[in-house]
Design a protein with these regions (language model features):
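Core catalytic ATP-binding domain of two-component histidine kinases
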Residues: 1-149
Length: 149
């Protein structure tokens, strides 16, 4: 997956998140999935390419919605210190074996998946000098966490 060099500018993370939430609400409402926002009072300002990062967020939220299928919740949270964005879902979760393969080219758990969505996400986040993790936790939530430099 070839990703263009990011054209990064200072952005308020909460505004970027809110724009993506509005875009994904229709998809989620059709599946009876509630998007719950917990955005920090002070909006973190991060350097990012708005267009690329919105594609990352839409991909993550879409994956979360597909994992839930119907009747669940997606939680979106931002924090300032550390500057972090977390997207958690009540979907079916990720087992340990799958977790190790998630960012491998052409690996997918979806019947017709091509395995390029997470590769795209990984490449964009690396180009933004972000650290990230994707795993399921004992509380039943699967969390995609992104830490900004």
């Amino acid at each position: 997956v070839r990703i263009p060099e990011p054209q990064s500018r200072p952005q308020e993370l909460n505004q970027v998140v809110f724009a993506c939430k509005r875009f994904m609400e229709t998809v989620c409402q059709n599946r009876n999935i509630e998007i719950v926002m917990d955005l920090s009072e002070e909006s973190p300002v991060v350097n990012l390419d708005n267009s690329l990062f919105e594609q990352v967020l839409v991909n993550i939220i879409k994956n979360a919605a597909e994992s839930i299928d119907r009747d669940g919740k997606i939680y979106i949270r931002t924090t300032v210190r550390p500057t972090c964005l977390e997207i958690a879902d009540t979907g079916k979760g990720i087992d340990k074996d799958t977790e190790t393969k998630l960012f491998s080219p052409f690996f997918s758990t979806k019947p017709n998946g091509q395995g390029i969505g997470l590769i795209f996400i990984r490449e964009v986040l690396l180009k933004h000098d972000c650290r990230f993790s994707l795993r399921s936790y004992p509380d039943g939530l699967t969390r995609f966490k992104i830490w900004f430099a």
